[in-house]
Every structure is written in structure tokens, then in C-alpha cells.
Curated annotation (Swiss-Prot):
The gene is def. Its cofactor is Fe(2+). The keyword Transmembrane helix does not apply. It comes from Edwardsiella ictaluri (strain 93-146). The keyword Zinc does not apply. This is Peptide deformylase. It catalyses: N-terminal N-formyl-L-methionyl-[peptide] + H2O = N-terminal L-methionyl-[peptide] + formate. Belongs to the polypeptide deformylase family. Pfam families: Pep_deformylase (PF01327). Fe cation binds at C91, H133, H137.
Length: 171
């Protein structure tokens, strides 16, 4: 397994629409395993393949406190959604930034697991929010796209400052 490089906003590759996985092969399973390793190393709760410059419809999630409830969603489809829940979201691709985003409170999804078996999942709360957030990545969308242009611009400026500080620290 390997820790992959996470793309950061405003990298345009984050805007790429992911393509469906046609067959769950050992290579796809390796990508899933690398994505989990990356997500845990970055202390995230979810990761879409788009975020690591792999433009296939693959998501990994683990919202458990003990980091022992892995969820793999390959080719996820949102079947149902209702209610509204607002939560302050963050993102590994938008470091150190958080914002309130409103999403469906209850969802039902269909996807393939790591072995290529189809399943359906009805969920709510943090897991429902996380699934929707990661599915957005597969469509080239970021949580900051739900914000006003002014708030997005402020986040962009903060990130540019952060990236400059990080670059100076490395040199």
C-alpha cells in the first residue's frame, strides 16, 4: 500500500468528472487500499479517487472513532434523498478551511463494494453527509462551490497564503 498525493484547490484536476469503473480488478482493489492508507494518513473521514488524481468513480469512507468501519463505494448512485441537514464541512483538498453546507439528511445509495458486489445503503447523519460530499468530488464539485463567490474568494486567498508559507518552510 502507498500514501498518494492529495490534490489541493485550486488544482483544476479536482474539476474532472470521474468515469465509471467497468470491472473491479486487483488494480482497482489496490487503488482502494491506497486510498484508505492516504485517508488515514491525512486524518480524513472520506476520500474520492478524484482527490488523488485518479478519475474513476471510487470513494472510501470511515467515519468511526476507532477507524475500523471501512466503507467502499464504487460507481455510487444516489437513489433517494430527503430532509435537510447543515453541517460545517472540511476537505482534504481544501486544507484548514471549513464552511457550513446544507445537504440531504437521509439518503439511499447503490454501489459496488471492494469485491465488486452490488449493495444498497440507507443512512443519515455524518455518514450521509460524507457520502454526498465525496460523490460531489466525482462530479468535479467541491464543498466551497456551495458558498457565495465572496466566501470562495476569501478561502482561495487564505489557501494561497498557506501554500506560500508551506513552500517557504520547505526551502
Amino acid at each position: 500500500m502507498a500514501v498518494l498525493q492529495v490534490l489541493h484547490f485550486p488544482d483544476e484536476r479536482l474539476r474532472t468528472i470521474a468515469k465509471p469503473v467497468h470491472e473491479v480488478t486487483p488494480e482497482i482493489q489496490r487503488i482502494v487500499d491506497d486510498m484508505f492508507e492516504t485517508m488515514y494518513a491525512e486524518e480524513g473521514i472520506g476520500l474520492a479517487a478524484t482527490q488523488v488524481d485518479i478519475h474513476q468513480r471510487i470513494i472510501v469512507i470511515d467515519v468511526s472513532e476507532n477507524r475500523d468501519q471501512r466503507l467502499v463505494l464504487i460507481n455510487p448512485e444516489l437513489l433517494q434523498h430527503d430532509g435537510e441537514a447543515g453541517i460545517e464541512e472540511g476537505c482534504l483538498s481544501v486544507p484548514e478551511q471549513r464552511a457550513l453546507v446544507t445537504r440531504a439528511e437521509n439518503i439511499k445509495v447503490r454501489a459496488l463494494d471492494r469485491d465488486g458486489k452490488s449493495f444498497e445503503l440507507e443512512t443519515d447523519g455524518l455518514l450521509a453527509i460524507c457520502i454526498q460530499h465525496e460523490m460531489d468530488h466525482l462530479m468535479g464539485k467541491l464543498f466551497i462551490d456551495y458558498l457565495s463567490p465572496l466566501k470562495r474568494q476569501r478561502i482561495r486567498q487564505k489557501l494561497e497564503k498557506l501554500y506560500k508559507q508551506q513552500a517557504r518552510a520547505v526551502n
